[in-house]
Amino acid sequence: MKKIRIFATALLLAFTLSSCESFFDVELDDQAKIEDIFRQKTEVQKYLSHLYSYIPQEEEVVGMHGWTVGRSDEALFSWYQWVYYTQFRTGNYSSATTNFNYWPDYYIGINQCSIFLKYIDLDKEDTPATLAYMKAEARFLRAYYYFLLFRQYGPVFIWGDQIADETIDGKTVDRHTVQQNIDFMVGELDAIKNDLPVRTDDIGIDGKQWAGRVTRGAALALKSRILLYAASPLYNGCDLYKGQMQNIRGEFLFPQSKDETKWEAAAQAAWDVIELAETGLYDLYKDTEQTDEFTRYMSSYQGVRLKPWNKETIWGWWSRSGVYSWLGGTGGLLACAMPGMTGASGAVYQGYGGIQPSLKLVDSYPMYTTGRYPVTGYQGENDMSKPIVDPQSGYQATGFTDGYKQPGIDWGDGIKAHNSCINRDPRYYACLVPNGFWWPNKTENIKFTCYNNDACTNKWNAGEGGGITRVGYVWRRLYETNKSLREATDYTTMKTVYPAFRLA
């Protein structure tokens, strides 16, 4: 009886294994092959759209694709707990740091672009002009992803037209030189610029439906940016790299001597963009509604970001947000910059107060009357409290003025303003709200106050985790005057374009 049970068990096991094998055996003959994908116009368009998906969210202020503000010296975060940017501000990072590691993403994007270029000629449904355009787009994006690698990691390995190895290891791979990187990227852009339309409408593609697709202006602008990098001191005979860093072929990765002709090449590339703009394609954004000159300048500066796809934008994309996506791409950024307004009505109105301008940035705005920059330096290396003032600028570092009429505010009473905030360039007031100034919303009718909470914001406390303004200024660049922010939809309906390249 025992032998019968063993035999039955073995028979059942054999049947089970046979069933499993037949279940996992897949007939691949009926599976779509990559060649089949590229024979269908709609699938080709999907694949092309996918190539754009590797563009990082540079406009994001938090999360793994963001914190660019906090990593710069132009702004401050009140957030200093559970945030990644502090690793870079404090120098606490190494080759093992995983935060902000875009290396694999960009090489995957490069690989996908090369695959697209390998198979695109199988598409017999699109016109020759459209095919040429899509090829040029893929080559542009491939060059752009190399540029992003170069910008963050310096010279990298160039695959050319080969299908890139997505697992390439930045710690062990042998790199091409700076000049080889520059030559490849610029060569790609030169090769495709005439295949890219000046406008997508020129080849029958709806520019509104396909907003953000690459055009000739984008290629010229990227070339200009790359050649500017090549001419800059870091990549043009920098003493730091002399006699250092060679690849396996014995080539120095960085140029060993300065080449002044690189500035000529950079200037010519920039001029090529300007010449294209002068055909009427691009222009500086100018407000046409405000009658007061000063207010018009303020509105023009804000409109560069608040008016989507205006003529100043050469190439960009709709603003996105990862961490605060529930507030929308633009709303998420604005909410992070908005002060926590305790005196305002509407619970949603409470901003996070997480981003503030640095005092160094505040001091960089010129004076309106003289046009001179008021602060030329500081007496202490890291002490911003003792600025070196240009006496001919008209700037006053101390004292207050009573009854000052705030620019752009035609409904509020005069305020007691610090003299350092008076008679500044219109861009100053378009970007900043200093301590004691009206928040630019006549419905709320409140003032921004940084150091007490009886009017607008909570007092900064260094012991708290953030969310409170640390300096005497807050951002308002993306805040449109008098815009209501009482509901979540007031944030989500805001749509702005992030300009990767603009005429300015």
Language model region names:
Residues 150-151, 155-157, 229-238:
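Short coil/turn linking the two alpha-helices of tandem helical-hairpin repeats
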Residues 20-68, 245, 404, 422:
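Membrane-proximal, proline-rich intrinsically disordered regions
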Residues 238-257, 451:
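A solvent-exposed, charged loop/short amphipathic helix patch at secondary-structure junctions
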Residues 3, 42, 162, 319-321, ...:
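Short, flexible loop/turn elements at secondary-structure junctions
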Residues 41, 45-59, 63, 80-153, ...:
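Conserved, well-structured interaction surfaces
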Residues 229-231, 259-405:
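Polar, glycine-rich mid-to-C-terminal structural blocks
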Residues 1-29:
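Bacterial Sec-dependent N-terminal signal peptides
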Residues 352-502:
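Flexible, polar/acidic helix-loop-strand segments at domain edges
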